Regions:
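Conserved active-site segment immediately N-terminal to the catalytic lysine
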Residues: 177-189
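PLP-dependent enzyme catalytic core of the Aspartate aminotransferase-like
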Residues: 1, 320, 324-352
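Conserved PLP-binding catalytic core of the aspartate aminotransferase-like
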Residues: 278-309
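Conserved PLP-dependent catalytic core of the aminotransferase class-I/II
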Residues: 40-49, 247-280, 305
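Active-site phosphate-binding strand-loop segment of PLP-dependent enzymes
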Residues: 114-170
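A glycine-/small-polar-enriched, mobile loop at the entrance of the PLP active site in fold-type I
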Residues: 2-59, 63
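Active-site C-terminal subdomain of aminotransferase-like
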Residues: 13-14, 189-270
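Conserved beta-loop-alpha segment that forms the PLP phosphate-binding cup at the N-terminus of a helix
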Residues: 52-81, 85, 89-93
């Protein structure tokens, strides 16, 4: 069986250097060695988040990291605002409702993302809401939301902003502190170039203060337990992979990594447009390209042929745009050879 070439919104190919790092021998996780590894990982992640705050690692998916933010920053019955501009943004609302929160949803345009005016209106309409859950990079659409002005607006009203950056971190430059974001959640399987199963949370001082007031029951995802501690068995192999990934990023240089992500995104979007298709996101990030084909185009057949004939996997649409588009992922490391092969294979599927 041939190895699949992944052009998914995540996971993607794990670079050889990262895979080898994850294959290093395991060791006692109740040891100084692990504490030193966690300190190194935290130091390496801070520049990617653009923060001087704390960074913690969870044995969970990105959704687990999202849930950790909800339970640590809210109390039962509390009113919260969720900005919904895609399937994964809506997940914030689903998690919050599961914990008995009073959820106020702001419906953003799925192609353009949320506007400052929409968020300003929500803050005026629901003045009792103290926490706003937003999505920087929407994995279901490819939209990259502008967080800077929104963050400053929320900060000016002494409220807490939490952002999902699962498909944006290490793909596009992030400035958590400068954008006045109080907590950011991600998963390992996208821009960080690590296998799935590691949640990462960056936490600023205002989020810590809010967590001290939270009365939502929590155990596994209790940030206070996790800070500077290893209360549960960690995803050790994934932490070792992340160590390799951060070394890779530091060796390449963050600016070069971001430029490469943008270059790959540009080439794929050029392919989409010259194939007579449309890029779904009007404000796209560098990690995911949502594609609207011509009316009547068989998207399922394209995906089948790419996989069966060329060994390439791409993704379908999700939620209310499921039947409108498909998605090409390029959130992680893509070599020139892989990109050229993808473009050639995609064009073959359309012409043969």
């Amino acid at each position: 069986m041939r190895k699949p070439l992944l052009f998914l919104p995540g996971p993607m190919q794990v670079p050889e250097q990262v895979r080898i790092a994850g294959d290093r021998p395991l060791f006692n996780h109740r040891s100084q060695q692990l504490l030193e590894l966690l300190a190194k990982l935290e130091s390496g992640c801070r520049p990617l988040f653009g923060t001087t705050g704390d960074v913690m690692f969870l044995a969970s998916s990105g959704t687990g990291a999202m849930e950790s933010a909800v339970v640590n920053l809210t109390s039962p019955g509390e009113e919260v605002i969720v900005v919904v501009g895609g399937t994964f943004a809506a997940r914030w609302a689903d998690i919050a409702k599961a914990y008995g929160l009073s959820v106020r949803e702001v419906e953003a345009d799925w192609r353009r993302g949320a506007t400052l005016a929409q968020v300003e209106g929500a803050l005026k309409g629901w003045p009792n809401a103290r926490v706003i859950f937003h999505t920087w990079s929407e994995s279901s659409t490819g939209v990259l939301n502008d967080m800077g002005e929104i963050g400053k607006l929320i900060r000016s009203q002494n409220k807490i902003l939490v952002a999902d950056a699962v498909s944006g971190l290490a793909v596009s430059p992030m400035s958590m502190d400068a954008w006045a974001i109080d907590a950011v959640v991600v998963g390992s399987q996208k821009g960080l170039m690590v296998s799935p199963g590691l949640g990462v949370v960056a936490i600023g001082p205002r989020a810590w203060q809010k967590s001290e007031q939270s009365k939502t029951p929590r155990f596994y995802f209790d940030w206070k337990k996790l800070k500077g501690n290893v209360p549960f068995t960690p995803a050790l192999s994934l932490l070792l992979e992340l160590d390799g990934a951060l070394d890779f990023i530091q060796t390449q240089g963050m600016d070069k990594i971001f430029a490469r992500r943008a270059q790959v995104a540009d080439r794929i979007r050029e392919l989409v447009r010259r194939s007579g298709m449309e890029v779904y996101a009007l404000k796209p990030g560098n990690g995911i390209t949502g594609v609207i084909p011509p009316k009547g185009f068989d998207m399922a057949a394209l995906r089948r042929r790419l996989e069966n004939d060329f060994g390439i996997q791409i993704a379908g649409g999700l939620g209310k745009v499921k039947d409108l588009m498909f998605r090409i992922g390029h959130v992680g490391h893509v070599t020139d050879e892989e990109l050229d092969y993808f473009i050639h294979s995609f064009e073959r599927c359309l012409t043969a």
